[in-house]
Amino acid sequence: MGKTKVVGIAGRYGTRYGSTLRKKIRDILEKRYSPHTCPFCGHKGKVYRLSTGVWACKKCGAKWAGGAYMPKTESAKLFSDIIIRE
């Protein structure tokens, strides 16, 4: 059987680092590479990460600071009115 059945995308690490850590990495990477919605134009699937914490939308060209693995963090959801000012 394949060694990536349980750990999925983190199977690229092979047998290194232990199964528990690879399962945690799997959860993080699945969130990072899942299709995200742009907070400016609302288009889903065109958001990508430029660098750590910097996200951009291919459709509208907007760039914003977010989390390292998610374009919008939990704290940003709570304080969205304060963070985004027009």
UniProtKB/Swiss-Prot annotation:
The keyword RNA-binding applies. A zinc finger (C4-type) spans 38-60. GO terms for cellular component: ribonucleoprotein complex; ribosome. Keywords: Metal-binding, Ribonucleoprotein, Ribosomal protein, RNA-binding, Zinc, Zinc-finger. GO terms for molecular function: large ribosomal subunit rRNA binding; structural constituent of ribosome; zinc ion binding. Its cofactor is Zn(2+). Transmembrane segments: none annotated. Belongs to the eukaryotic ribosomal protein eL43 family. Binds 1 zinc ion per subunit. This is Large ribosomal subunit protein eL43.
